[in-house]
């Protein structure tokens, strides 16, 4: 009897782990309506010094078949140290269920053919 009770408790506990999982593929691929604020927030963790960014540009979210996820490409030039800038960089922000999931460094296929527009908000980040 104790084993059955223990198994029931464990099943209920593990059942709660999947509580916030997306219901379907359409939920997983929800359009990232707040993609700019999500990217700005993530850049604070991604960059050692998020201030003084130059030449920032961004693409609109595009559903890429290779990943089956929405992708937003970002170009920018960040500080290398207090006196120098690094080379221009391009990264891809991957979205899952309409929320930022991760960055991909040196994207090739993910950013092929996208159109970039100015992203002044990224250039105004504070520490």
Regions found by a protein language model. Give the residues of each.
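Cystatin/cathelin-like cysteine-protease inhibitor module
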Residues: 18-127
């Amino acid at each position: 009897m104790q084993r059955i009770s223990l198994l029931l408790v464990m099943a209920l506990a593990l059942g709660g782990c999947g509580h916030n999982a997306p219901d379907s593929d359409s939920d997983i691929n929800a359009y990232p309506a707040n993609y700019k604020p999500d990217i700005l927030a993530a850049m604070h963790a991604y960059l050692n010094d998020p201030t003084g960014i130059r030449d920032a540009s961004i693409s609109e979210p595009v559903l890429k078949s290779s990943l089956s996820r929405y992708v937003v490409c970002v170009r920018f030039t960040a500080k290398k140290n207090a006196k120098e800038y690094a080379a221009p960089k391009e990264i891809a922000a991957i979205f899952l269920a309409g929320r930022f999931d991760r960055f991909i460094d040196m994207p090739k296929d993910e950013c092929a053919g996208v159109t970039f527009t100015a992203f002044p908000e990224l250039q105004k980040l504070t520490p």
